[in-house]
């Protein structure tokens, strides 16, 4: 495509189109969460986030490059999102972005990020108050990351304790807790405001490098499909097209093998299709799956 080589998460039916998370050969990495409270105009043609990220991966090396990239894009940008970026020089920031402007949130600012990290779901802090989505999931993640902090943040712990978490902060329940487990009753539970949801299609942890390290060591840990029924595969840009066959497009399945198998297991978990059945998950089956996809689920 020209520019930097990159590795990205794409839709199975559009591999040359939008990129939803990715890293390039310089260690620059990007992701986004959709925002639902930042748009302040009536422009109809939107949803260019994935195309924006694909372009950024080709031309950006640093967080500052991304900022310049946003500055020079034609308006309207046709996005409403929180873009998260890191680089190989210690840069880390979110950019709350709408059609005309962006608001930078620097993860290295101790006043803004005293714990050294920022958490986003589907609203922007600069957006309209109490609009947007994901407020309960935001509180879930805050608690999970606070508890995780003392033991250190590793890809394995983030996948296990966040991506596969069934904690709900508003209800103060954790389905992984033996005493609160739905297995004590029918084995079924209503899915509402957990981090993994029916519509979840992947979970990715990008393990960056410290300043001075080889940016080729930047690792894109990738779990395709429904995160609780998937496994994480490490990927590197330098491998080019020689990535694991589990995560690359398979014409026989019209998706990646890992995604296909994960979704088959997910279908068993969300097996009720009449009425409001898709709001219910079969925890007993999911628990059995977690025993195999997770190193140490709680009893």
Roles of regions detected by a PLM:
Residues 292-299:
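Conserved small/polar residues in nucleotide/adenosyl-binding loops
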Residues 32, 46-74, 138-176:
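Alpha/propeptide regions of enzymes that mature by internal proteolysis
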Residues 11-14, 35, 86-89, 164, ...:
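Short, flexible beta-strand-to-coil junctions
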């Amino acid at each position: 495509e020209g520019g930097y080589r990159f590795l990205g998460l794409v839709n199975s039916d559009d591999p040359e189109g939008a990129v939803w998370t990715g890293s390039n050969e310089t260690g620059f990495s990007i992701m986004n969460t959709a925002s639902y409270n930042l748009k302040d105009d009536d422009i109809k043609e939107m949803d260019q986030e994935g195309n924006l990220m694909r372009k950024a991966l080709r031309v950006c090396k640093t967080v500052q490059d991304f900022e310049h990239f946003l500055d020079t894009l034609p308006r309207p940008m046709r996005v409403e999102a929180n873009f998260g970026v890191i680089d190989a020089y210690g840069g880390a920031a979110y950019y709350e972005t709408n059609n005309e402007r962006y608001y930078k949130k620097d993860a290295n600012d101790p006043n803004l990020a005293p714990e050294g990290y920022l958490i986003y779901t589907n609203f922007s802090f600069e957006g309209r108050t109490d609009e947007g989505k994901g407020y309960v999931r935001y509180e879930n993640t805050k608690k999970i990351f606070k508890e995780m902090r003392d033991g250190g943040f590793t890809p394995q712990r983030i996948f296990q304790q966040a991506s596969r978490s069934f904690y709900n902060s508003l209800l103060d329940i954790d389905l992984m807790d033996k005493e609160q487990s739905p297995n004590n009753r029918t084995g079924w539970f209503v899915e509402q405001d957990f981090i993994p949801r029916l519509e979840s299609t992947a979970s990715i942890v990008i393990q960056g490098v410290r300043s001075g390290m080889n940016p080729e060591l930047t690792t894109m840990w990738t779990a395709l499909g429904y995160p609780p029924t998937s496994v994480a595969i490490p990927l590197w840009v330098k491998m080019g097209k020689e990535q694991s066959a589990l995560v690359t497009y398979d014409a026989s399945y019209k998706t990646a093998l890992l995604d296909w198998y994960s979704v088959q297991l997910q279908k068993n978990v969300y097996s009720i299709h009449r009425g409001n059945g898709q709001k219910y998950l079969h925890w007993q089956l999911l628990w059995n799956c977690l025993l195999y996809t997770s190193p140490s689920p709680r009893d």
